[in-house]
């Protein structure tokens, strides 16, 4: 029964991966093409269901999530000379799915007292 659901899950994971590449690499055709070719190659190598099929599907889903939420591309918009050095300016393509962290955890971490001479887990 599980083998019958794996092809549907694999197709779904493949489609999610293709959508994630389109979001992450929109406007950069060579990289988009290379990412999609690699995804196809990996799925073609795993065409026959096996013991590790669920792990490979999970890997594809996690890869799609990382591509969608953590990849930001930059394009060079100008090069200027400032102070005798070449300075490049880039525009970042941040989209609606890009994960934006907040600094609340970093700010809160600085408020804890530091224990000197004790391990991290000792009282």
UniProtKB/Swiss-Prot annotation:
Gene Ontology CC terms: mitochondrial matrix
Keyword flag Chaperone: yes
Key words, A-Z: Chaperone, Mitochondrion, Transit peptide
Top-level taxonomic group: Eukaryota
InterPro entries membership: Complex1_LYR_LYRM7, MZM1/LYRM7
Chief subcellular location: mitochondrion
Subcellular localization, as worded in the UniProt entry: Mitochondrion matrix
Single GO MF descriptor: protein folding chaperone
Protein name (database record): Mitochondrial zinc maintenance protein 1, mitochondrial
Organism: Arthroderma otae (strain ATCC MYA-4605 / CBS 113480) (Microsporum canis)
Organism lineage: Eukaryota, Fungi, Dikarya, Ascomycota, Pezizomycotina
């Amino acid at each position: 029964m599980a083998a019958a659901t794996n092809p549907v899950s694999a197709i779904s994971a493949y489609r999610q991966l293709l959508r994630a590449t389109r979001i992450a690499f929109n406007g950069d055709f060579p990289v988009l093409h290379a990412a999609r070719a690699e995804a196809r190659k990996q799925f073609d190598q795993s065409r026959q269901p096996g013991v590790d099929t669920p792990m490979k599907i999970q890997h594809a889903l996690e890869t799609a999530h990382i591509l969608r939420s953590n990849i930001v591309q930059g394009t060079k918009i100008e090069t200027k000379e400032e102070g005798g050095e070449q300075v490049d300016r880039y525009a970042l393509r941040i989209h609606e799915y890009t994960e934006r962290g907040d600094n609340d955890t970093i700010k809160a971490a600085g408020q804890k007292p530091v224990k000197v001479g004790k391990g991290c887990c000792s009282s």
